[in-house]
């Protein structure tokens, strides 16, 4: 009996540790010489939230777009649930996208649509759901992100930036996705509203049992929403570990970045000073 239980426990543990998203040797070059990704290796475990950090131009956004299928990598493998996604057909890509939810850097709302219609957009247009059913789901999600029901009948222009971000989050979770992507989710928000959004992200991801992949410069957001953190530098993942180990990474690049220090191995090109008029 004990032997059987051990096997069951082992199987359960393996299932929980399965990679929901797996990138191996992913490269991408733009033009003839701008090699942005130089062999990205990264795994996101099922049900975990991983945040990619790194400076501007290091490859964060390109990595995210490759996973989403918005950019085609030059080489390497990108698997979702063990299925290779590089080079799949349009129909296979459409089926895969049904697993995804996305909160964009800007809320990316349609100005001419009411809030509930924005939240329900993917349900109606992407899944062919009737408007009544989509409306009910949209209103449920609007309340789930802390907005009053009447907000659902307003236009995006009538909302503050923080409220628009909540609407974007409601849209991201409308179809109960298996994987949610967050692109700089707190950009443009004051510290208090940023923390509100971070708390909502944690709650929504947990309630859905979803896997999350995010990119951000906001270290307060990283510490709040991440289970694991990966740092990308010059197109490669140079550190990957638990968020609790971030301050003790032993990596000078990570240490410099998370503390925002000018001095360190990461160098920034300073602008050439303007010459004084003679």
Task: Tell what function each PLM region has.
Residues 176:
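Conserved catalytic motifs of ABC-family nucleotide-binding domains
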Residues 68:
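Helix-to-loop junction immediately C-terminal to a conserved catalytic motif
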Residues 155-159, 163:
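Conserved ABC ATPase signature
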Residues 180-183:
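Catalytic Walker B motif of ABC-type/P-loop ATPase nucleotide-binding domains
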């Amino acid at each position: 009996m004990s032997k059987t239980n051990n096997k069951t426990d082992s199987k359960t543990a393996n299932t929980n540790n399965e990679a929901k998203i797996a990138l191996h040797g992913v490269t991408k070059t733009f033009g003839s010489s701008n090699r942005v990704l130089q062999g990205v290796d990264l795994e996101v475990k099922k049900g975990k939230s991983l945040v990619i950090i790194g400076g501007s131009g290091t490859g964060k956004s390109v990595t995210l777009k490759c996973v989403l299928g918005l950019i085609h990598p030059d080489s390497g493998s990108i698997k979702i649930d063990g299925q290779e996604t590089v080079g799949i057909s349009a129909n296979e890509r459409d089926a895969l996208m049904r697993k995804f939810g996305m909160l964009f850097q800007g809320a990316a709302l349609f100005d001419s649509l009411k809030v509930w219609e924005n939240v329900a957009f993917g349900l109606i247009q992407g899944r062919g759901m009737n408007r009544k059913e989509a409306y009910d789901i949209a209103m449920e999600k609007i309340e789930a992100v802390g907005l009053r029901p009447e907000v659902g009948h307003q236009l995006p222009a009538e909302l503050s930036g923080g409220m628009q971000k909540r609407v974007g989050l409601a849209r991201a979770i409308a179809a109960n996705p298996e994987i949610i992507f967050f692109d700089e989710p707190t950009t443009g928000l004051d510290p208090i509203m940023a923390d509100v959004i971070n708390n909502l992200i944690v709650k929504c991801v947990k309630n859905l049992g979803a896997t999350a992949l995010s990119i951000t410069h906001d270290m307060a957001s990283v510490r709040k929403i991440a289970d694991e953190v990966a740092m990308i530098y010059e197109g490669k993942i140079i550190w990957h570990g638990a968020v609790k180990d971030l301050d003790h990474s032993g990596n000078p690049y990570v240490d410099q970045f998370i503390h925002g220090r000018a001095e360190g191995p990461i160098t920034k090109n300073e602008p050439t000073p303007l010459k004084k008029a003679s």
